[in-house]
From Swiss-Prot:
The gene is rpoC1. PANTHER family: DNA-DIRECTED RNA POLYMERASE, DNA-DIRECTED RNA POLYMERASE SUBUNIT BETA. It is found in: Plastid, Chloroplast. One of its GO terms (cellular component) is mitochondrion. This is DNA-directed RNA polymerase subunit beta'. Mg(2+) binds at D496, D498, D500. DNA-dependent RNA polymerase catalyzes the transcription of DNA into RNA using the four ribonucleoside triphosphates as substrates.
Length: 689
């Protein structure tokens, strides 16, 4: 096992993953390994995978066992078996085939590399927006693309010597003899010396330009230019002002990019590749489907294309010195395009397709998007002690509670229930405990409720865009197959009760449970973390419900007193009681809200029936300048002053005996809920102080 790479992915030592450009030396250190016989392996030089007769990996190919390790643990390519880790069996190495006797899992992380015959620009840094190479060099992207793909060249700064650009320009203006003699020079052996000395093209030209400038000088010059543009002010021309604004934004991005390279100690020339890493074989497998037909990952075919073209370029550079320069440039362009297709198929236009007109999946297609390696496998992987279901409204729940279906609850807390069954000696072992859970015995639900009483759960709704996307709740067993939520927590999750799903997780460690209780409970996250406004406010269904609850008695006594339609709200019988008087002709009078709610439960009045409720002697209820609508006198001398929404009972001496307010059962219910909530808050506050 490569110690450098294994230490890099040690999950106990490292708790983060950083993605960035890597130097050729680091790629070589990850991929190269020294065999016991002193041979260094790691470079993939052949575009082959498996031999068609023996069905074994080809030597120095994409699945070579010498580079990536054995396919079967302890078995080399010859078929000999050696016990892994047994020193008595001799060296863990087959001298005949050169394969180490190690665990086959090494093929999941042992890399290889391809030594490119020419530098290749990384297409992510060139074509992706923003183009880091174009920003750093302060050159148009189209010009850099033409340079990378060998469409034109630039002259190296050599004084008093002809340059390639001057010679190409002289073709149109020089005499006819020189027009035909100079191109012949480019097919001679002397052209190589001239080309390497005076002209530069392809990715090597980009690499030279990236390695040349000082990043601190780039930052200083960009800052000076930005200040000069800022001092100029408005030109009066809208188009020129927008152009200056775009230039200033570009300079800011350029300074940030140069600062990033300095801070991370990354050399800009790493954006041009000299060594191309080869993924471990297990991450790009070849499998056999029904009928023995092999099915390969698209990455393998793209790697083969790169190796074919790279070898085609390597042969004339190493064996023949009479190869025309234009042919070499053309082959370098093909290598660049092959690597582009491997990294990001289709970024330069039409994507590469197979024989069935199917687009090959490149590195970018494998790792990006919802089904990519990061979001699906690393970030969105399935975890234990978690479930998922549709959310519905639980209006009777407290703000910090949620209702879990029985199926989800028993599955999430199964291990805790098993421990409880064994502790209470209901079951003697795990097997018997599981059988009792499957049979759904009553004792199981009792233990489950006891376990859930002291264990919070986490609810998460994707996408988790802010911290309120994950909140903690105290679970209770609910009926049905959906997760019940208080409607006030809907806004924090940005959820709707129209089929949205939520995931539920069980925090296992004591630290996680403490964090859930102290920081993540829903009743402790009532304010928006972004702007500080209340986020647990009634919306949608709750507002409609409150409106319907209090819709009665909104036009006063004058609109309803003599309206025959209101008579259907009253019963035909006369009820005489000490607490209230109820007749067909009169609106009922109640001494307390409990009496009114009792009459509603007995269906003597409905939710919207106007009634008179005795109220405390509060002068704020009485409007001093209001004139009574009607005054009713009784035989004992007392009289009632009836106003729009209240009435005052006075004695003969005009003293106020009592006050009645005109309301409905809906208003009473709403008021009592608010009153109980305020009293509960005051009690909690007094206990806390």
């Amino acid at each position: 096992m490569n110690q450098n790479f294994s230490s890099m992915i040690d999950r106990y030592k490292y708790q983060q993953l950083r993605i960035g450009s890597v130097s050729p030396q680091q790629i070589s250190a990850w991929a190269n390994k020294i065999l016991p016989n002193g041979e260094i392996v790691g470079e993939v030089t052949k575009p082959y995978t498996f031999h068609y007769k023996t069905n074994k990996p080809e030597k120095d190919g994409l699945f070579c066992e010498r580079i990536s390790g054995p396919i079967k643990s302890g078995i080399c390519a010859c078929g000999n078996y050696r016990v892994i880790g047994d020193e008595k069996e001799g060296p863990k190495f087959c001298e005949q085939c050169g394969v180490e006797s190690v665990d086959s899992r090494i093929r999941r992380y042992q890399m290889g590399y391809i030594k490119l015959a020419c530098p290749v620009t990384h297409v992510w840094y060139l074509k992706r927006l923003p183009s880091y190479i174009a920003n750093l060099l302060d050159k148009p992207l189209k010009e850099l693309e033409g340079l990378v793909y060998c469409d034109f060249s630039f002259a190296r700064p050599i004084a008093k010597k002809p340059t390639f650009l001057r010679l190409r320009g002289s073709f149109e203006y020089e005499i006819q003899s020189r027009k035909y003699s100079i191109p012949l020079f480019f097919t001679t052996q002397g052209f190589d010396t001239f080309r390497n000395r005076e002209i530069s093209t392809g990715a090597s030209a980009i690499r030279e330009q990236l390695a040349d400038p000082d990043l601190r000088i780039i930052m200083d010059r960009s800052l000076v230019e930005w200040k000069e543009l800022g001092e100029e002010g408005s030109t009066g021309n809208a188009w020129e002002d927008r152009k200056i604004g775009r230039r200033k934004d570009f300079l800011v991005k350029r300074m940030e990019l140069a600062k990033h390279f300095l801070r991370t100690n990354v050399e800009p020339e790493r954006m041009v590749l000299c060594l191309l890493p080869v993924l471990p074989p297990e991450l790009r497998p070849i499998i056999q489907i029904d009928g023995g037909k092999p099915m390969s990952s698209d990455i393998n075919e793209l790697y083969r294309r790169v190796i074919y073209r790279n070898n085609t370029l390597t042969d004339p550079l190493t064996t023949s010195r009479s190869t025309p320069g234009e042919l070499v440039l053309c082959q370098e362009k093909l290598v660049q395009e092959a690597v582009d297709t491997l990294l990001d198929n289709g970024i330069r236009g039409q994507p590469m397709r197979d024989g069935h007109n199917k687009v090959y999946k490149s590195f970018s297609d494998v790792i990006e998007g919802k089904e990519g390696r990061f979001r699906e496998t690393l970030l969105g992987k399935r975890v234990d002690y978690s479930g998922r279901s549709v959310i519905v409204v639980g209006p009777s729940l407290s703000l910090h509670r949620c209702g879990l279906p029985r199926e989800i609850a028993i599955e999430l807390f199964q291990t805790f229930v098993i421990r409880g069954l064994i502790r209470q000696r209901v079951a003697s072992n795990i097997g018997i405990a599981k059988s009792k859970i499957r049979e759904k015995e009553p004792i199981v639900w009792e233990i489950l409720q006891e376990v859930m009483r002291g264990h919070p759960v986490l609810l998460n709704r994707a996408p988790t865009l802010h911290r309120l996307g994950i909140q903690a709740f105290q679970p209770i067993i609910g009926e049905g197959r959906a997760i019940c939520l208080h409607p006030l927590v809907r806004k924090g999750f940005n959820a709707d009760f129209d089929g949205d799903q939520m995931a539920v997780h069980v925090p296992l460690s004591l630290e996680a449970q403490t964090e859930a209780r102290l920081l993540m409970f829903s009743h402790m996250n009532l304010l928006s973390p972004a702007i500080g406004d209340p986020i647990s406010v009634p919306t949608q269904d709750m507002l409609i419900g409150l409106y319907v609850l209090t819709i009665g008695n909104h036009r006063g006594i004058c609109a309803n007193r003599y309206n025959p339609c209101n008579y259907r709200n009253y019963q035909n019988e006369t009820v005489d009681d000490n607490n209230y008087q109820y007749t067909k002709e009169k609106e009922p009078h109640f001494c307390s809200s409990y009496d009114a709610l009792g009459a509603y439960r007995q269906k003597r009045i409905n939710l919207y029936s106007p009634l008179w409720l005795r109220w405390r002697l509060d002068q704020r209820v009485i409007a001093s300048r209001e004139v009574p609508i009607e005054v009713q006198y009784e035989s004992l001398g007392t009289y009632h002053e009836i106003y729009g929404h209240y009435q005052i009972v006075r004695s003969i001496k005009k003293e106020i005996l009592c006050i009645y307010i005109r309301t409905t059962i809906g208003h009473i219910s709403f008021y009592r809920e608010i009153e109980e909530a305020v009293q509960g808050f005051c009690r909690a506050y007094s206990y806390g102080t």
